[in-house]
Amino acid sequence: MTQNQLDKKSEAWSALFSEPMSDLVKRYTASVFFDKRLWQADIEGSLAHAGMLAAQGIIGKQDHAEIERGMAQIRAEIESGAFEWKLDLEDVHLNIEARLTQLVGDAGKRLHTGRSRNDQVATDVRLWLRGEIDLIAELLVALQLSLVDIAEKNVEVILPGFTHLQVAQPVSFGHHMLAYVEMFSRDAERLQDVRKRVNRLPLGAAALAGTSYPLDRELVARTLKMDGVCQNSLDAVSDRDFAIEFTAAASLCMVHVSRMSEELILWMSQNFGFIQIADRFTTGSSIMPQKKNPDVPELARGKTGRVVGHLMALITLMKGQPLAYNKDNQEDKEPLFDTVDTLKDTLRIFAEMIGGITVKPEAMEAAALRGYATATDLADYLVKKGLPFRDAHETVAHAVKAATSHKVDLAELPLAVLQQFNPNIEKDVYDVLSLRGSLNARNILGGTAPAQVKAQIARHRARLA
């Protein structure tokens, strides 16, 4: 077929219509310039489909061989940048099919037997997303290991733990970092669970009702290493819940990144001064020469909003659609693609950035002392002396008030002053009131005692190995 003939037949449905499509409509409906990233999945799915057609005797062995030859050339052309993507051909699927037909003639025309673009695109997106989930899983491991590394280096460093952004109790800095490891480990689990539902084969559903050809859908699923086939043809081509579910899991992961970003931004500020982010991950000011700005965590915090917005876009896209396929579903790709790109870029840069953080233990400890972080330890001390907790709570509140008025820490109050609040207080109270003593006392599974933190680090290293 000549190029002129191809151009005239660029629309797969052109014989039915009495006038050509408006150029404005072509531009409005075309998706090739963003869905062309699906080309590998499209070729992979088409080859599996062609192999099945040949195995079932629906196309001949020679046609199958020609399709494989043509697809190999198309793959080489795309990889080299020589492939010409055409707006008139609307999307990645028709672009590849048209080029295949140009290369191998009638064999290329037979490829679409028993297949619709409806089940084709659903298959392509699933294949592509499966691969992206696997890449994201690797990036999540790298980020978790980076957090485990910084935790291991700072097990003994004391950080003020906060509630309501007020100093609450002392914690190990390593323990704090491991909290994010736990969050990201759940994100990884969620994504692996999503993968199970992504990895199902729509091919064979055709436009919406299945096909009269004797297709072997299970063979195609095995060829593509999918976990099974979609069991209802209407559902297979019309729903994008797998994309919504992935974007929901990605949104949660980005929310965890955003929470960590907020803390890094605060900790780097002069008012906290707990950490320094490496220069290569910061920027300066065009007017204020003293500035070193945490742009990376700030942008991650902002990009989280965009990813959550994509989730809302996809949910809204699906909510009003009747069965089966509607053109609305073309709008699933840009939010999905951008979610994947944003999440991968963010995880990649954070894994590197965390490794370049300088921790400032003196500033952290000073902040913990200023905030009376061992007040709860004093209350626990009094409970162990027989005082009901609520009475102990009130007693310690009076002691904190006295320390505040004298502008000293609880541990700096003389024993005689402490005994004014409760005569059962003895000299051993000063062991309890030290930051180190408070930390070591939390020696319970999941607690912040260094021994527990070290055990958790070992557990995470074994899990991530």
Curated annotation (Swiss-Prot):
EC code(s) of this entry: 4.3.2.1
GO molecular function terms listed in the Swiss-Prot or TrEMBL record: argininosuccinate lyase activity
EC class: lyase
Annotated CDD domains: Argininosuccinate_lyase
Coiled-coil features, chain-numbered ranges: none
Pfam families per record: ASL_C2, Lyase_1
Keyword Protease on entry: no
Biological processes per GO annotation: arginine biosynthetic process via ornithine; L-arginine biosynthetic process
Principal subcellular localisation of the protein: cytoplasm
SUPFAM superfamilies tied to this protein: L-aspartase-like
Catalytic activity: 2-(N(omega)-L-arginino)succinate = fumarate + L-arginine
UniProt-listed InterPro entries: Arg_succ_lyase_C (IPR029419), Argininosuccinate_lyase (IPR009049), Fumarase/histidase_N (IPR024083), Fumarate_lyase_CS (IPR020557), Fumarate_lyase_fam (IPR000362), Fumarate_lyase_N (IPR022761), L-Aspartase-like (IPR008948)
Keywords annotated in UniProt: Amino-acid biosynthesis, Arginine biosynthesis, Cytoplasm, Lyase
Pathway: Amino-acid biosynthesis; L-arginine biosynthesis; L-arginine from L-ornithine and carbamoyl phosphate: step 3/3
Listed GO CC annotations: cytosol
Keyword Ion transport part of the UniProt annotation: no
Cellular compartments annotated: Cytoplasm
Family listed: Belongs to the lyase 1 family. Argininosuccinate lyase subfamily.
HAMAP family, alphabetized: Arg_succ_lyase
Record PANTHER family: ARGININOSUCCINATE LYASE
Name under which the protein is recorded: Argininosuccinate lyase
Taxonomic source organism: Variovorax paradoxus (strain S110)
This protein's encoding gene: argH
